[in-house]
Amino acid sequence: MTASVEKLVYYIKAGDAVTIEPVYKVEGFRMNSNAGVKYTGNTYIEVDICHQHLWYYVNGELFLESDVVTGKESDPERATPPGAYKVWSRESPRKLGTYAVQGYETWVNYWMPVPYTGIGLHDLNRSAYGGDIYINNGSHGCINLPLDVAKKIYDEVTINTPVMIIP
């Protein structure tokens, strides 16, 4: 019998009307714990693929937010992988891709890779960001940002800053 059920049975038998907190077998992801154990802390970047938006929180306060373009959703090889990552490094400038391997090559001003697979946050000059651009005209998996947004993030972010990419 689970701990929650045991508690409920006890209170039912006692005839008590109470409100109890369930006992969880597995604890889910938390940004901060009340017990003082920090999981991601309160400085992190969140990227929402479905809404094509990014939020960057520094010390619990919204530092900036922006529309983005993520990986080309209609091509599984280019879709941005959801997950919990961290900023791996910071490079400025950086050449991404090679014609020989990826079939493209582009220079970016601000490069912040997140997983080891070569996907990251970077500036890319596009006519628009957000909306449904990513479905058929998305990136090769990276999170494309307007230049001014990429610069602000690059100037503030540190290596190991958590990056949550949600579907």
Predicted regions and their residues:
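Exported/periplasmic cell-wall-interacting domains
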Residues: 79-80, 95-167
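Structural recognition of the beta-strand scaffold that forms the well-ordered cores
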Residues: 45-48, 55-57, 64-66, 86-89, ...
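A short, polar/charged loop-to-alpha-helix boundary motif
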Residues: 73-81
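A short, sequence-level motif marking secondary-structure junctions
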Residues: 68-73, 125-129
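Surface-exposed, secretory/extracytoplasmic low-complexity segments enriched in Ser/Thr/Asn/Gly/Pro
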Residues: 1-68, 72, 84, 92-104, ...
